[in-house]
Amino acid sequence: MTKVGLRIDVDTLRGTREGVPRLLATLHRHGVQASFFFSVGPDNMGRHLWRLIRPRFLWKMLRSNAASLYGWDILLAGTAWPGKNIGNANAGIIRETATYHETGLHAWDHHAWQTHSGHWSIRQLKEDIARGITALEAIIGKPVTCSAAAGWRADGRVVRAKESFNLRYNSDCRGTTLFRPLLMPGQTGTPQIPVTLPTWDEVIGPAVQAQSFNTWIISRMLQDKGTPVYTIHAEVEGIVHQPLFEDLLVRARDAGITFCPLGELLPASPESLPLGQIVRGHIPGREGWLGCQQAASAS
């Protein structure tokens, strides 16, 4: 049996309103639990449109047929009008999710984090994280114990900024296996659970066709030599590709794969995890930098 952590990112108002309820129903039908990470502030995702001038981002949008995949309400959100507050508008849905699944913070403002966190000061990072955690805790009525940086935009500064929030774990980077981030010699931070597998929008296109994606990703899960963690998005697998995701759950079960919340991947003694650090890097299919796992020594 292969255990795969299932992470569900919720980036937008529509993803929360439409995608999450469908995913909750789908997961319930198949007896699967996952980790949901919510954006709870303004939905300004449409402001990413200016990135179309960047060839890699434009190619990604064309390759994934973004208008069909996400819908124009997502692609234009927060452009000609102020972005609506996701958490306030969907508190009931978020509370229901937290009743049945591990629930953590993705971002206060997903667009702002993805665009500006790379040059924010530690103080600004802490303020933004605190704003998101406070809002999410007010909605779900219990402490937030985990987080996942929007767009995997994280580095050593983000790791340090999150230390004051006493989280059980963070999932801020791409990598191969769980690790303890080294803050300074002799001092480690909150365990990191990296995403190890590609997302739909990173690979779909000439190399991998939509109809063969499930077969392809299951093969990658079975071949993963680390701690497999897979990310889906409420805006994709919860809406236009919900049937594809349901088919994935069936095929994965038949292949001996069990999905679980990320928290279940943590060992009883996190001190046994290897040391590592998060550095800025790049991966195929994703425009811009993102946090990547790198080995570190204790010295």
Curated annotation (Swiss-Prot):
Pfam families in alphabetical order: Polysacc_deac_1 (PF01522)
Biological process terms in GO annotation: 4-amino-4-deoxy-alpha-L-arabinopyranosyl undecaprenyl phosphate biosynthetic process; lipid A biosynthetic process; lipopolysaccharide biosynthetic process; response to antibiotic
Keywords assigned: Antibiotic resistance, Hydrolase, Lipid A biosynthesis, Lipid biosynthesis, Lipid metabolism, Lipopolysaccharide biosynthesis
Cytoplasm as UniProt keyword: no
Function: Catalyzes the deformylation of 4-deoxy-4-formamido-L-arabinose-phosphoundecaprenol to 4-amino-4-deoxy-L-arabinose-phosphoundecaprenol. The modified arabinose is attached to lipid A and is required for resistance to polymyxin and cationic antimicrobial peptides.
Domain NodB homology: 2-260
Enzyme class: hydrolase
Pathway assigned to this chain's UniProt record: Glycolipid biosynthesis; 4-amino-4-deoxy-alpha-L-arabinose undecaprenyl phosphate biosynthesis; 4-amino-4-deoxy-alpha-L-arabinose undecaprenyl phosphate from UDP-4-deoxy-4-formamido-beta-L-arabinose and undecaprenyl phosphate: step 2/2; Bacterial outer membrane biogenesis; lipopolysaccharide biosynthesis
UniProt cross-references to PANTHER family, sorted A to Z: 4-DEOXY-4-FORMAMIDO-L-ARABINOSE-PHOSPHOUNDECAPRENOL DEFORMYLASE ARND-RELATED (PTHR10587:SF137), GLYCOSYL TRANSFERASE-RELATED (PTHR10587)
Gene3D superfamilies reported for this sequence: Glycoside hydrolase/deacetylase
InterPro entries in alphabetical order: ArnD, Glyco_hydro/deAcase_b/a-brl, NODB_dom, Polysacc_deacetylase_ArnD
Superkingdom per UniProt: Bacteria
UniProt organism field: Salmonella choleraesuis (strain SC-B67)
PROSITE patterns associated with the record: NODB (PS51677)
EC assignment: 3.5.1.n3
Catalyzed chemical reaction(s): 4-deoxy-4-formamido-alpha-L-arabinopyranosyl di-trans,octa-cis-undecaprenyl phosphate + H2O = 4-amino-4-deoxy-alpha-L-arabinopyranosyl di-trans,octa-cis-undecaprenyl phosphate + formate
Protein name, entry field: Probable 4-deoxy-4-formamido-L-arabinose-phosphoundecaprenol deformylase ArnD
UniProt family annotation: Belongs to the polysaccharide deacetylase family. ArnD deformylase subfamily.
GO molecular function terms listed in the Swiss-Prot or TrEMBL record: hydrolase activity, acting on carbon-nitrogen (but not peptide) bonds, in linear amides
